[in-house]
Structure formats: C-alpha cells, structure tokens
Amino acid sequence: MLTSTLLALASAALASAHTVITYPGWRGNNLKDNEEFPYGMQWTYPCGGLTLTQNRTYWPTTGGAISFQPGWFQGHATAFIYVNLGIGNDGPDGGPKNMSFPMVSPFQIIGPGKNPYPGTFCLPQVSTPAGFEFKEGDNATIQLVELAIHGAALYSCVDITFVPPGDPRVAQVNESNCFNSTDLGAADLYTINILESGRDRLALTSAAASLARMAGWVPLVAGGLWLML
C-alpha cells in the first residue's frame, strides 16, 4: 500500500512539469496525457514521447535563437536547463542516434514561485557545438532538457534543417517570440545564495565549497554518535 502511494505521488510530480519551445519551433504538443502516457509525456527521453516530425524548422548553420516557456505547470520555482544537439538521420526513428552535443553551458532558471506562471526565456544566439561545421540541408534536432525541482527530467525537441545565415526561410526573431520575462532569473548551475551571519546581504559561494565544509563536519558528527552508543 505504501509503495503504491509513493508511486502515485511520484507520478503526480512527473505530470506537473512541462516546457514549451516557442522558437525556432517545436516537435509537437506533448503537454497532454493519454493511455500510453497516463502521467504525461515530457518525462520520456529523448523528446518527450514524440517521434521525429517531417515538419522541420530552418535554422542557420552558424547558430541562432532558442526561446522557451518553463513554467506551464507547477514545480518550476527553480530548474536546471540543458540544451543539446543530436545530429543526422541514423537513429531508430530517422532522427539522431543520441543527443550528445551540448550547445550551451547548463544553467539554472529562477521562477516567481512553484505554481504555474507565464513567462518566456530567450537565448538570442546559441552557437552550434564546438568542432562541428554544418552545410545547407544537414538535419539535426535541438533537445531542451529541464531538470525540475522535484528531480524529474523533462524533454522537448525541435527538428531543424540547417540553411545559410540570412536565408529568408529562417523565421524572424522578434520581441514577440524571443524575449526574457521580468519575473524570470538565471544563475550559474553550481552557485547558491547564502545569507552571511550578522550581515544583511547575500553572498555567492560555490556548491563545491559548501560540500567541502560539510565534509569537515562528518568526523565530528560520527564521533558524537559513537559516544552515544
């Protein structure tokens, strides 16, 4: 009984997290649930339960904008964002074999709260992965991963075809499809905010440094517990 209850709670958490890619396009609507995905689609690797689309979006060979809305459902007070590229047509569904090539350094988004919220986050110029050169007509898939606060990874994709910069087939980037909402913030992935004792200001410290300090407490705690035995 307890196991089934925990599974239901975990499934509810998974179903509560959704992201929409607003530019350059979107593989398709995976905000829904159905018999195959009773708790929602977006937790399914690699593209949130959707197979390759033939309705590809044109994107410059030198890179371009990516815009998304991270807070469609609850559970996004904070989240980690990853943007990856899958290359080619050799995968099982005619798309990439994997999504192994990072396009940006992972970062954290900070929303206004845990409840659903409107808001758009824009990366105005995302380069193609280092070491790759693409030519007109090459196919790829951009994968957006949102690691939500409850621990679930949510996946959305857009299938692209590369074209030269300035090609008129590339959708125009403007203030309506690529902008940063004022109630959304961003931070380095491994940076946290702490309030220093006796001071009314926030200081930034790395998570690694925090873990190092915690490691120093472990022998003291262990010794205290041993004395209590």
Swiss-Prot record:
Residues annotated as binding Cu(2+): H18
Compartment(s): Cell membrane
UniProt keyword list: Cell membrane, Copper, Disulfide bond, Glycoprotein, GPI-anchor, Lipoprotein, Membrane, Metal-binding, Signal
Protein name as it appears in the record: Lytic polysaccharide monooxygenase-like protein ham-7
Family: Belongs to the X325 family.
Lipid-conjugated positions (GPI-anchor amidated serine): S206
Function: Lytic polysaccharide monooxygenase-like protein that has diverged to biological functions other than polysaccharide degradation since it does not perform oxidative cleavage of polysaccharides. Acts as the major cell wall sensor that regulates MAK-1-dependent hyphal anastomosis, the fusion of hyphal cells. May also act as a cell surface-bound protein that functions in the copper-accumulation pathway.
Biological classification of the source: Eukaryota, Fungi, Dikarya, Ascomycota, Pezizomycotina
Source organism (scientific name): Neurospora crassa (strain ATCC 24698 / 74-OR23-1A / CBS 708.71 / DSM 1257 / FGSC 987)
GO cellular component: plasma membrane; side of membrane
Disulfide partners: C47-C157, C122-C178
Cofactor binding mode and count: Binds 1 copper ion per subunit.
